[in-house]
Each structure stands twice: as structure tokens, then as C-alpha cells.
Amino acid sequence: MPHLPDSMSPEAPAGPAPATLPAHPAQLLSDVAGLPPLPGVYRYFDFDGAVLYVGKAINLKKRVSSYFQKNHGGTRIGHMVSKIVRLETTVVRSEAEALLLENNLIKTLNPKYNILFRDDKSYPYLKMTGASSSSNPGTSFPRVSYYRGAVEKKHQYFGPYPSAWAVKEAILLMQKVFHLRTCEDPVFNNRTRPCLLYQIKRCSAPCVGHISAADYAQDVANAERFLRGDARQVMEALEARMMAHAEKLEFEQAAELRNQVAALSNVLHQQSVDNVADRDVDILAVKVQGGRACVNLAMVRGGRHLGDRPYFPAHVEDATEIYNAGGFEEAVEDSTTAPPVPSVETQVLEAFVAQHYLNVPVPPTLIVSAPVNKQLLEALAIQSGVKVTAVHQPREQRRVWLEMAQTNAGLQLARLLSEEGSQQARTRALAEALDLALDDLDALRVECFDISHTAGEATQASCVVFAHHKMQNAEYRRYNINDITPGDDYAAMRQVLLRRYGKLAETLREAQQTGQMPAGTGRLPDLVLVDGGRGQVSMAREVFEQLGLDLSLIVGVEKGEGRKVGLEELVFADGREKVYLGKDSAALMLVAQIRDEAHRFAITGMRAKRAKVRVDGGKLEEIPGIGPKRRSKLLQRFGGVRGVALAGAEDIATVAGISRELAEEIYRALH
């Protein structure tokens, strides 16, 4: 970490903008002065080593120097520049390389002042199994299934699809039109009669020989052609086969094909793909309002509209102001004619295109609601090997698709703003109800603990985190509770609080003595919720007194009369009287939301642990000489299988009916 002089602060001073340039470490200014006039990517770091901003430049020296050659005042860019203490750069060969590297780094480093589209789950695919095997008859009859993950060459994958629902709709279509199987191979290989799907005309029952391998292969081929967009050809082939069977007076087979043709015709009509020339297209519509943005991605694959998916970027206001104030200057300086500054919509859309298609196949055509930089499309083509065209202001069917995407973007953004407004109101109500002194409601951090077990078995504690007006799933933690009397919730609460805050409390004490806070140190929450009444709060108070932490942070959620929802009361560790907020209180709604999430998280973890313990518990009875009675005595003596596993052979031999030799056998079996 760079050393700051005593006269400097990592934060910009409050108040009016100074007349002089903000001070920066000499090493930083020296690094800036020594930059080459070459294309590249730069990263700014603050005092704690966190990445502030990632940018690209045609001329690194000119671009980076512009940040430090003038006073930016109290703007967002000024606030960011005041925090910069270190710089890193990477020289590249071209602007296209700079674009790709910049957005790779943005996704990897999560800088505070860049437009950031956070990674979501990978896209789902429709999987069709392949690679016939003589040892597995099922592979001669491929199955269709939902799939998410790494692909294997021996199978075929169609997609990606925007959602799991879209894949399941496609699978249902494969069943209705082509009667393809969906059962797992072990089920397929061991069936002796058709399943219900055969009865309702959604499977041809290849498992029991109701269709030949050749006919099933024909259905598979038609399904593949349909998924690739050759719907018309599939329809013509089915009609030709139907007429051929009719001419041979094979009316039952002709009727089956007639039903397939009717089902396929209905699908094509519903999805409006009768005369669509586009095979694979992504439609991107952006809506910006209230400092937030939504990019709605609609996907057309094989000429079929598969649905859409909304994305909500972070840091829109900060990033666009910095781009407009500084990031775009270079484009003006390095061009003979000054182009107009891109709109916020264009900046958001370009950020999405650059980040989204790093890990997702890009189709040859993008239909966009705002213009996209040609250099960005060239960079995508270099990365993917596919020539990419962006169509702005489309016509005919493309225009219909774009209008649908724009409508959905507006609806999704309105929903988000409404939800955020409601959640912010709840946060404010909680802060006011508990007299929490906060300058920034966004910074309110609540951690909630819950204990879960079944009759003392598989005890786990959960900790969930609420911050920035929403639950922070990535910060959830589970704690396995050991070495306590089974069922002792108070001891479990004591253990989890010590483990959660013990090291942090020690670090804070050392920082008070040295006057320096180590980099990367976490912070105490503004509120610690425990699911329980006075007993749990008393235990939490003992732990905080032992650690020297502020007792006013602790609040217990005590169930009301009859344990009815809405009658909960808040119990305080610092001696304040209990508070009843009222069943319609926004503050209580937030407390209940956090408490219920902690309970859900604890329950799911406890059930998984209990299932594992019970499966492992079968090992005891597998040991020669251990029957139900001796197993029961062992579990009763040591509190569970884990306790038996942790015990030594000498301890195990103290159990009635367990000899020294058997104890050693048990010890070996469990280790």
C-alpha cells in the first residue's frame, strides 16, 4: 500500500472546491509523467487498494494526464480524482484490444466509477444427447433436457435461452410436436411399459419399442432442423411423409403425422415466424430514469422469439458523469472533428454490449434502441470471429421486436424503481424507529443471526446481511456449531457471535492503540438482529461486553402473544424498554423480512447437514458388531455421529457393551 504523507488524507476535503489542484503522492505524479503516448488501459486505486476506475485510451499519456492537470471541483470526477493514490497501466496494440481488455477488467475488478453489469447465472440451453453406445441402449434414442453449465462435444446444445422458462417451453414443444423422450437413461433402460407421457401423446415410448430407431431418428432430425430455424422445411417434410402413408393406406401413421403438422403449424402461428428472414438476433433496448437504467435483452434463435431478460447496471450516474467530463475528452482531442457526446442511453448500451458478450456467443445481428460505436462492433468481431452488425431504427418485424423490448425495458425499470422506493422507505422507517444516526441510508448495514437444529441434531447458525436497501446474498454465512449441549440455543448464539465478531473486535482495539486501520478490515454493522427475546439478547450482551463492543447495536426480535405475525416486539441489550412497532409499520416489515431470511437460510443449511449426518450415520451399523442398540448407546453418549468420530478409541471403549477391540474398529471405520 502506498504511504501517504501526514498532511494528506485519502478523502477529498469537504466544503468548497479548493483553488489549487488536489495533492497526490509524488510517485503517482511521476508515473503519470512517464506514461507513453500509446493505446492502452489504465486503472486508478485508492488508499485501501480498491479499484476506483478502469478506462481505455488511444494516447495513455494525454488521457491520464488530463485528470491531474485541472481542478474538477466538487463533482463526481473531482471526488474520484481526490482519492487516487496509485495507477496501473497496460499498453496494447490497438483500440480494439483496449476495448476488450477494459471491459474484461471492469467485470473482474468491479470498479466503483464504471458502469457495471454484474455477472448473473450462466444462460440455460436445450441439450440433446448424442454419441450412441452399445452398452447403453438409451443413447440410440436421444433425449432432450434442460442444461446449464460446461458443454460436451458429444452432445448438441441449442440456445442460449434467456430463462429457464424459455427452455422448458422449448422442451414441451419437442414433446408435443416430435414426441421426443425426456427421461433419464437409467429410467429409460429399465422401463417395462410406457409412462404417462406416452398416454397423453408427448412421447413415442422408444423405451418399450413402440417406435423404431429409424423413425425416432427422423423425429430427432426434424427437431434439430426446427431448432436451427428450418421450420418451413420441416413442415414440408412432415406433409410429404403424411401423404406417402396415406397413399399406402397406412392411415394410422398418416394421422400421427397430421397431428404433428397441426401442432407445428400452431406453434409457428403463435410465434409469428411464418415469413421471418432473421435466424439469430438479439434485440437490445435501454431505458434510463431516476439515476437507474435497464437494458432489456430479447433473443431470437432459429427465427423464434424466445423471450427476454432485464439487466440493471450499477454506478450509472457516477460513470456517465466521469465519462462526459473526462472520458470523452480524448475522443475529441484525437479526432479532427469533434463528435457529439454520446447519450447516457448509448453509454449504457455500449457498456452492456462490451461486457455481456465477453462470455456469451454473439449473434450476427444486434437490433439496438441507441447507436453503438463501430469500433466496439469491430472488437466483438475480433473476439468472437463473427461479423457483427448493429441495426438502429429498424423496420417491419425488427421494429416490432424492438418496440416490444423497449416496452419491457420501461416496465422493468418502473418495477425496479418502485421496489427500491419501497425498500428505501422501509430502511428510513427502521433508522427513525431505532434512532440510528446515519448520514447515508444506503450505508445502513444489518446482520441477523438465527439458530436451527432438530432436537439438538445438526445445529447450525446463520448470518444474513442487509445493506444498500437489499439482502446481500454473497455475504451470507453459515456456522457449524460444535462442542455444546445438544439443543442449547444460547450456547450456540454465544459461539456464533464470538466467531463472527471476535477477530474484528481485536483488530479494532489494535487500531485504536496504533491509530492505523489495516487495509481490508471489515466494519461492524449498524444493527445486529438476533431471532429471540430477552434470553438471546442477554447472551449477545455478554459476548459484546466480553469483546468490548457497543451494546446498542444488539436488538432482539421477540415473538408477540400467540406468536402471531405483526405482534413482534424489539428487545434492546442496552437497557431500553421494549418497542412494539405495530403490525402495519414499515420498519417492522423490514425487520421481519431480514429475520425470515435468516430463518430460511438456517433451515436449509441445517436440513442439508442433517441429511448428510444421517447418511453418514449408516456407517456405524456397517461396522461388524454394531447393531441398533450399540449404535443408540454411542449416539446417546457422544451426541451424534460427529461426536463419535471426534472421540478417541479410549473414550469409545467407555460405552457399555463396547470392548477395546471394537472401539478401535469403530475408530478406524470413521477415520
Curated annotation (Swiss-Prot):
Organism domain of life: Bacteria
One Gene Ontology CC term in the entry: excinuclease repair complex
GO molecular function term, any single one: DNA binding
Residues of the UVR domain: 232-267
Region (Disordered): 1-20
InterPro entries, A to Z: GIY-YIG_endonuc, GIY-YIG_endonuc_sf, GIY-YIG_UvrC_Cho, Hlx-hairpin-Hlx_DNA-bd_motif, RuvA_2-like, UVR_dom, UVR_dom_sf, UvrABC_protein_C
Compositional bias segments (type: Low complexity): 10-20
Subcellular location: Cytoplasm
Chain ranges of the GIY-YIG domain: 37-115
Biological process annotations from GO: nucleotide-excision repair; SOS response
Record keywords, A-Z: Cytoplasm, DNA damage, DNA excision, DNA repair, Excision nuclease, SOS response
CDD domains for the chain: GIY-YIG_UvrC_Cho
Principal location listed in the UniProt entry: cytoplasm
Entry similarity comment: Belongs to the UvrC family.
Function statement: The UvrABC repair system catalyzes the recognition and processing of DNA lesions. UvrC both incises the 5' and 3' sides of the lesion. The N-terminal half is responsible for the 3' incision and the C-terminal half is responsible for the 5' incision.
Quaternary assembly: Interacts with UvrB in an incision complex.
PANTHER family according to UniProt: UVRABC SYSTEM PROTEIN C, UVRC/OXIDOREDUCTASE
Protein's name according to its UniProt entry: UvrABC system protein C
Organism: Albidiferax ferrireducens (strain ATCC BAA-621 / DSM 15236 / T118)
